[in-house]
Regions:
Chain A
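A cross-kingdom feature marking charged/low-complexity
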Residues: 41, 45-68
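Short, well-ordered alpha-helical segments
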Residues: 4-40
């Protein structure tokens, strides 16, 4: 009952909008039973520069979901 | 005169909107003389996932304020 | 041909709007050949507090551009 | 023959007893071929506080198992 | 409603028994509103050696409690 | 279109030759859809010593591949 | 008897003289029961530059004092 | 008189019982004048897994002893 | 006479051969007075994967050269 | 107006006197527009030993100056 | 029987060839009972630059050997 | 000839004067062949507080000396 376990997987989400959207894409694209409840931890934030402008936001997140 | 000191306290702010709002809540909810001028440093960013969606943004910040 | 090098420079961008804007200012203000294509990595996020409110967002980023 | 590889997965184990039990639960609950021989590395230790008492021990571990 | 904040304080607990007891002492000795619900994070583990034997376990923990 | 995500998995490659070979083994032995294009990041480098000589090179790498 | 706890607070001391003086100011300005015996740990060292000269030394220290 | 020095050595202790026992073994097995008074700092915690069960606890500790 | 200073710049070198070659390219491509004597420090090692094979080695190094 | 940027450069200062002097030399020897107002952050402290005595203090600092 | 301990010592190996050779020199030059079986962990990689070329590879490794 | 190795040992020096003196004591008290030429790296700086005043400066340094 009180014995629980959570598995963490590391995902990089990419968005042209902003960092929050990049995180949300990382969460949305995560499959194999990680769509339920859980939490995320931001590990790294990067992005692409094209012609001197930020053109992509990239967020690496650890996504945790309960192990059944 | 030139001898100053600043105290830092660590606070986790939570918001359903975005990371900047979570940081602003951490700053706003901080009491005991920390409402004046100072600065913050982001220590950690996490969040909650419900039904496969980001439902809360959590920012841990160190908030610094002058010691009188 | 396959031998390339990228130089990274560390820049702190400041904005009254939000963290993404602070990053974009760091990228835009970077000179000496770093205006082309490349990438950035967020190193640190801080900000200023005035009268108990966040009044400036400060993002330290490493900006990478190709060495000709 | 001498070419081996090990895959690491990150798991959070939770126990009401102590940290060692939390680690053992993380190991026991790990599935997909990780039940064999291998090793674990403690990444983080946290826990829950209820009514001013520690009520749950949480250990995040990297669990390594041989890739066939 | 959804706007919450948690304050973290750093405490070193000392015990002659074991690490879990040292953590529990850190939690128990924490005052000013931190006696309610919340969580802890282990930051550091050390101890004293007397006559070649471990004679004290010392755990540094961050203790988080809700800001009202 | 611009919404992409990459999953990272952590693998330890072992080789009797050198560190680059250990990294290549980690990449080659990685399964479940990670055989396509992507990148790796070196996390840790270790090795075995037998009779005072290095007899195995071990490289821990994060291997990233696109999530379909 | 053997159950003790120490609380750590983080303080930034500023001095125009040198780093040791900045640390001593951080210790001296710390209030609420931290004036007794204990220890400090240096967390960060920074300073201000005016007209190309170091004009202020800033030391961030964790100051630990016994919890009664 | 007030001039003292302590030497730190890094030792990995292994036990089939638990982490505290692994630390105590590291302290007990340390030779060359480190058997006296001093302190230890936990650097890393790992362990072995056999048939899906934790079969050994391994604690890496820095052990400090006074230099005569 | 005894007052010296060294400037460090961060460069990413890329090679199809191996990590040492990637470091040598980073050193060779570094301009503006850094071609003299000095030293380098490896900061990060990554690489590209194409069709499941390592196709590029990338080494980030800090290159230090004397300030005249 | 409120859009500002600061560039950081990493410099190692060396002095036979003490650490503060090594930092001041790093600041003084820094060229290309970094002579104005700004700040420094200590990154590393090392030194040389000759015949069992400290003969040089070396401080690595990040020096930040406003980008015009 | 199951109570074992390993001592780690930190050694910097230098080679004009490559990083693996630098590591092997660190292992070979290590004395006082560390010539047996054990393992190493790479802690840092640096090198010397002469006339704009890499002229020495330096690897700092922790070398672990069983305590009898 | 070009094959060299340096051994590092970790020492905590204590002084009532200042940090540089604490470092010099760590270097001076180091025995077994470490009295020759080499270098040190500052790992940690702490100190004791008595009656609200800094009464001891403690510097942990890695001291490197050539292996014959």
């Amino acid at each position: 009952m009180s014995e629980k376990a959570y598995k963490k997987i590391r995902v990089v989400g990419c968005s042209v909008q902003n960092m929050e959207k990049a995180i949300e894409i990382a969460v949305a694209k995560t499959t194999d039973g990680h769509h339920g409840n859980g939490w995320f931890e931001v590990v790294e934030m990067r992005g692409a520069i094209t012609d001197g402008k930020v053109t992509e936001w990239q967020a690496t997140v650890d996504i945790a979901a309960k192990v059944d």
